[in-house]
């Protein structure tokens, strides 16, 4: 559909949230300035080719950004075949952006027999409200999920004891959030309130651990590209600008937010979107849900990372730094952070004094780097020599700690 539109119009500016595969057509890419509001995996290949304009917008602000910054006047989405009453359904992928249908002048939709009819809020539109329709039947994209590795499982093991029966889950994408979801089989009366519902959460629903009247999401990224009747019957689809509103999300009881990040400093500043000055991802819903969890009664947020990463030359570097390096950005401020978790433990930083934060962060760093981090903190006047002395003797690398 996008290719056809681009062929007929000299210049088309594309503003997109999370799905950019249509731009892989050379006809589209050559003639469409592309603005990404998230910069997902599919978008990153466009960084190398040029023509990508990056933005980092909190997901609950995406519709406002599209309206006020980009002045989007046309919405293009894929929809289901109409039902007996003439309603087209946005399905498990398109509902996230459906709020835009009230903000634009034109709605050009592609009917796809493989798009499924979902339930929820603002999840459908009557055919009479659509400017133009075309048709292209094709299977929906499938999403491959890497199974959690041993390190992911170690990180999840520090979170699982802090999740209670009856809590409400928001988990992100990746090995660590998947490990958390898999580890919750056997729990009771859990709710799911998440922007992206993944295969791991679908399996959690099927395990019996979830109260099926408490499942809401904006996007479903399933491995099959097709939801079964069980999932369709129990997932309520909500536009992302509505679901991610921190004030709405905070109404969920015991909101548990689990997301990944790239690095953090000793005071708890978290970078989840840039490496060496290059935008790698976007803020997405991380900050939305960190703030929502803090407001939720009994809520907790967990930002997770491996304690180290290995450079191409084999050099091991700590992902916990005394200070964020040049080129890093602060995705989640330290004043919002609750828990930061590595394979070495979970550091509870919420409203803690700076020296307490620094000691907690050093304890969850890899043992090889703890002494050096403590010395840097002393040199910067952030930690007293007496407090730093506890890190002079390092535990064995296999020893785990919890703060």
Could you describe each region identified by the protein language model?
Residues 1-403:
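Conserved alpha/beta enzyme-core scaffold
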């Amino acid at each position: 559909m996008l290719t056809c539109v681009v062929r007929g119009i000299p210049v088309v500016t594309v503003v997109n949230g999370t799905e950019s595969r249509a731009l892989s057509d050379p006809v589209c890419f050559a003639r469409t300035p592309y603005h990404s509001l998230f910069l997902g995996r599919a978008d990153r290949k466009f960084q190398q080719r040029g023509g990508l304009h990056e933005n980092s917008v909190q997901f609950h602000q995406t519709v406002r950004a599209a309206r006020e910054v980009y002045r989007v006047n046309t919405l293009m989405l894929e929809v289901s075949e109409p039902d007996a009453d003439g309603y087209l359904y946005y399905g498990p992928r398109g509902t996230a952006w459906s709020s835009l249908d009230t903000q634009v002048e034109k709605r050009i939709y592609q009917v796809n027999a493989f798009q499924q009819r979902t339930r929820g809020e603002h999840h459908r539109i009557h055919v009479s409200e659509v400017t133009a329709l075309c048709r292209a039947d094709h299977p929906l994209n499938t999403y491959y999920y890497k199974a959690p590795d041993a390190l992911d499982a170690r990180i999840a093991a520090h979170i699982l004891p802090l999740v209670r029966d009856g809590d409400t889950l928001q988990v992100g994408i990746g090995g660590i959030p998947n490990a958390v979801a898999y580890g919750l089989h056997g729990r009771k009366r859990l709710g799911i309130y998440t922007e992206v519902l993944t295969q791991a959460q679908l399996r959690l629903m099927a395990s019996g651990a979830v109260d099926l009247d408490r499942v809401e999401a904006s996007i479903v990224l399933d491995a099959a590209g097709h939801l079964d009747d069980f999932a369709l019957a129990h997932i309520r689809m909500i536009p992302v600008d509505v679901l991610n509103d921190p004030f709405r999300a905070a109404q969920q009881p015991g909101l548990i937010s689990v997301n990944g990040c790239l690095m953090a400093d000793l005071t708890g500043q978290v970078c989840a979107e840039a490496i060496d000055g290059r935008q790698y991802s976007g803020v997405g819903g991380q900050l939305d849900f960190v703030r929502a969890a803090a407001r939720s009664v009994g809520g907790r947020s967990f930002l997770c990372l491996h304690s180290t990463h290995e450079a191409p030359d084999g050099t091991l570097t700590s992902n916990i730094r005394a200070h964020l390096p040049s080129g890093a950005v602060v995705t989640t401020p330290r004043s919002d952070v609750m828990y930061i978790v590595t394979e070495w433990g979970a550091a509870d930083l919420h409203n803690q004094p700076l020296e307490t934060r620094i000691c907690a962060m050093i304890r969850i760093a890899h043992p090889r780097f703890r002494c050096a981090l403590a010395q840097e903190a002393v040199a910067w006047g952030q930690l007293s020599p007496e407090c730093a002395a506890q890190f002079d003797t390092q535990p064995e690398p296999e020893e785990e700690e919890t703060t």
